[in-house]
């Protein structure tokens, strides 16, 4: 697959999961890192990694949510974006909470509680019930 094809595929996926993400990345980082952050997240992250075969999109996002939860509070903004994306990909609030809770074994209970609090903020903002 060409880089342009991956970018176009990533652009479509990014717009489905997180409308406006590409523009937000470009607006925030483009002046400092031209042709870097948006291109990497959209082209490589979404167009190549998230679009791979082997795991469906919902599962990939649940894995991502779990990893971000285990990494701790410094990933809160990315965690919230990926919780919202997981909902858009068909994950239930319960599945997301279970993925986060599972990570208490690896990242600790404080990290899991902080991640659950971030997820609940997303659920409430999206009107998602337990």
From Swiss-Prot:
Alphabetized InterPro entries for the sequence: 4CMD/NDH-1_regulator (IPR052512), AhpD-like (IPR029032), CMD-like (IPR003779)
GO cellular component: plasma membrane
Function: May have a role in the regulation of NDH-1 biosynthesis.
Main location: membrane
Subcellular location: Cell membrane
Organism superkingdom: Bacteria
Pfam families in UniProt: CMD
The protein, known as: Uncharacterized 13.8 kDa protein in nqo9-nqo10 intergenic region
Signal peptide (UniProt feature, chain positions): none
GO molecular-function term, one example from the UniProt record: peroxiredoxin activity
Keyword entries, A-Z: Cell membrane, Membrane
Membrane-topology descriptor: Peripheral membrane protein
Keyword Nuclease listed: no
